[in-house]
């Protein structure tokens, strides 16, 4: 193995700024020149070149990262803190949310997860990954048609340079200010990508949780008719397991288009409670508190207290632990809620044992209640009025 010629590479990379990733020679690893290599970021500004095999080795060792090979300029537009975003101090749409919440049901989640986890794998660069993303798009469009919302609500694929596409559903509001609900649709077997990867919890559970919220939200005539103040989007990301590839591509485009994303909530792993219960602890949802937007995270706690039957616990997951990190890097307020405290989360992920039998659909339903409350409250929140000081926060 030979050392990469980092000085030659450096000449091809834009000069670093406070928002650009700085490529340091000391960060480069030993490479075989005949192998494709990828630039990953394991911490803010800390990068190294790796092969795909080395990516999976790092993941097996518990190292999370962003693959920034094609997204080195993510965050370069200077959107971060360009303007202060104020979030509500309390929930004000209880009647509407609780009425819509009656439509939330574990049966559709179970049926959808059975289908999603039946694909041999949802590895993003496989034919199975393509087929599973086709199914996600088909299912979302089916929900739109069943709700009679196809004149206003749309769903489309977001293509990538790999096989699996992301899916974006859009519910137009009165303004272009946007609330994003996200989950990643891909799965991975970290021992070898071609091996079976049912991915029931990671992140089949999040995928079907936000599907169910989307289905329930379309029961609102006000939402379907575009009466929400803000536009609402549901994202099902491709290639999260490869280094947040799909979400980075989307938020890179949004950043370049100067899209006004007011809030992004990620749901990644929503179904496993055994670790919590076995530890003698009460069932709860885990609110991530590192590498997230503090104000948005505080609001999420308020939403959980208002709309969930179980409490929240604070927990940490490290840098780039899910797709909210892509939104955050682009300068958008983002947050992440997981099934439990991080140390009590599902030990079966990334293996053939990530199966439905280990999951609680009642727990997933709590995540759905939280997500529905979150998206409805913020969908109808007047951010402009709040900034002016005329609205109640």
UniProtKB/Swiss-Prot annotation:
Binding of Zn(2+) 2, residues: 202, 241, 350
Superkingdom classification of source: Eukaryota
Nucleotidyltransferase found in the keyword field: no
Pfam families reported for this sequence: Peptidase_M28
Alphabetical UniProt keywords: Aminopeptidase, Disulfide bond, Glycoprotein, Hydrolase, Metal-binding, Protease, Secreted, Signal, Zinc, Zymogen
GO CC annotation: extracellular region
Glycosylation sites (chain numbering): 176
Molecular function as annotated in GO: aminopeptidase activity; metal ion binding; metalloexopeptidase activity
Name listed for the protein in its UniProt record: Leucine aminopeptidase 1
Encoding gene per record: LAP1
